[in-house]
Amino acid sequence: EMVEISIMENQVLFKTETMYFYSRLLEGNYPDTNRLIPTSHNTQIEFYVPELLSAIERASLLSHEGRNNIVRLSISPDSVVLYGNSPEIGKVEEALNYENVSGEALDISFNPDYMKDALRAFGDMNITVKFLSPIRPFTLEPTETELDFIQLITPVRTN
């Protein structure tokens, strides 16, 4: 199908036989995401995406019932555990399957919705998750090195 593209100063129009799609440029500067992406890490772990996504979905069922919508991932050299909590309903604690873990032990909290969206973009593959600290953004990347794709998740500070 042919697509006609019209570009103006602050807008663009895509036209097909059955659709018109219009978008305009937002004012202001886009944040410099290069500063957010860590260049080093202290903890690294490999997961199979469908298994991790299923666990996040289960934990988020409880976290959505609470006020904060946060899950916690606890990584140690011999175990990886995902926690969800809702004061009204209860807690979930699930030991996760993982391939390789290296580096320092870590407890980090994050919004499960952002993590689920990031994981869905990868599909059926293994990813490597790299952490610098519990308060710094962490990255998700395909384990296969020929793919150049990265997701960035910002953690949530908890008490």
Annotate each PLM feature.
Residues 36-40:
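Short hinge/gating elements
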Residues 1-26, 41-159:
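DNA polymerase processivity clamps
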